[in-house]
Amino acid sequence: SSANMSFRHKDRIYISATGSCFGTMKKEDFAVLSMDGTVLSEKKPSKEWPLHLALYEKSSETGAVIHTHSTFSVLWSFVPAKNDQDCIPDHTPYLKMKLGTVGLVPYEKPGSEALFQAFRERVGASDGFLLKNHGPVVPGKSVMDAFFRLEELEESARIAWELFRAGLE
């Protein structure tokens, strides 16, 4: 798998299991966690479940989290940020309207405690996140809300990347 997603239902977090694929995912492909991160199912959760848990802890409004390795977000993460708390320029108003600020999290090995610590240190400062050389992590009130916010982040990263390549950024 090259991504992971989760949603909150009552006092549980349902997160894509290790090795699951968005394109073929069924309800059996989710691991179940308690709100303190205890695994409650036989399925093994994505190794990046602590990123998700940090966003659920940040806000009771968070109902879902999506993390991908989408092309333009990853490309943009290589460009030196002018502002680590808001690293994707808002060339159109929609990124701010739909998501807000996008914080840059320094590169750490995927799935590592160092990554989770770097993420926790920044989780309060921004609305969405870009893991350097890795990809975006976006919370939402629902799965569709998280998806729409992620889509806007990726489109904004594409616009910024194209302007950067053209020497206009």
Task: List PLM regions with ranges.
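Glycine-rich flexible loops
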Residues: 1-169
